[in-house]
Amino acid sequence: KEKSADAHILMRNYMMERFLEHLSFSEYRDRFVLKGGMLVAAMVGLDARSTMDLDATIKGVNVSTEDVEKLIDAIIAVLIDDGVSFQIKSIMEIMDEAEYPGIRVSMTSVFDSVVTPLKIDISTGDAITPKEVRYRFKLMLEDRSIDILAYNLETVLAEKLETIITRTVTNTR
């Protein structure tokens, strides 16, 4: 079971990387800012990234289900010779109690007949101080990186501290 779980985690992380590469070639590469667990794991050099979803904030795009669907459709339509296809399964609003709106995109990715579910949580209006950075996201299985926008380390840490303080409960983040 452990090896099966590890294989599922590896495949999910690989598919999230594939999504990021599609993003890096899309018209939205300068609007989509990576944050959250996947970024933290990449920054500190964890090989076994076990985050359940991809977290991002969007700049200059309304965060409505319709606008996010157009954005994700454009990203997954980017043609890359990687053998991976994506399909949106559902899009719903999240963070109703938060100051800023958010959207959760549930997708499936397919690679060589293996179907892997993915979730992307998207927000807007987040303060990134002083600003987002160009980040060279190192791929797990290839000796190269993807150029994407990401939170700077200070904002990642500040957001994690805010989560701990405002929720006043222990969570997995």
List where the protein language model places each region:
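Compositionally biased terminal segments of proteins
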Residues: 1-173
